């Protein structure tokens, strides 16, 4: 495993490489693009070691990984608060249903205060529409929402399982 940074973060943004079980033997999904991880390996990642005492977690899950995502959140030391749904412009793969949504679980560790700007609490929405682009790339609308709702001066942010560097964010993953 790649070592985690020796730093504490108030904002954790994670898009784990979930091991999905498809209906056939042909590689058609995420396994064509990057190495996948078993649920237990994601659950057991020592993410709590890099979390500040008061932190926010934004954890991407596919529809069939919702329950496991809640287990991951708990094992990483966060309490579930809400779910944010990305409504996509076109459907993807699926078994019984073809997916047109993806979800980001929001959790809190400790008591990170609400972000206040000009006397008003900054709030996001629990759903948004954005076009799909390349495989597994998450929409920038989500990152902007995170920065609106959670980021405050002096906070450290990290993108776990990152596939690209983003200004102002720490990154961790085997695709950087």
What is the role of each PLM region?
Residues 1-176:
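Class I S-adenosyl-L-methionine-dependent methyltransferase catalytic core
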């Amino acid at each position: 495993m790649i070592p985690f940074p020796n730093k504490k973060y108030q904002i954790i943004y994670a898009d784990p490489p979930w091991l999905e079980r498809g209906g056939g033997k042909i590689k058609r999904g995420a396994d064509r693009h990057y190495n996948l991880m078993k649920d237990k390996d994601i659950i057991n990642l020592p993410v709590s070691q890099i979390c500040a005492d008061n932190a926010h977690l934004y954890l991407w899950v596919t529809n069939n990984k919702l329950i496991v995502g809640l287990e991951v959140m708990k094992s990483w030391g966060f309490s579930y608060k809400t779910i944010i749904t990305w409504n996509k412009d076109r459907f993807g793969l699926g078994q019984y249903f073809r997916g047109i949504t993806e979800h980001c679980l929001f959790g809190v560790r400790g008591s990170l205060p609400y972000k206040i700007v000009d006397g008003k609490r900054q709030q996001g929405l629990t759903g948004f529409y954005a076009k799909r682009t390349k495989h597994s790339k998450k929409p920038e609308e989500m990152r902007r929402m995170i920065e609106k709702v959670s980021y405050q001066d002096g906070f450290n942010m990290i993108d776990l399982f990152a596939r690209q560097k983003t200004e102002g964010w720490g990154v961790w993953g085997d695709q950087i």
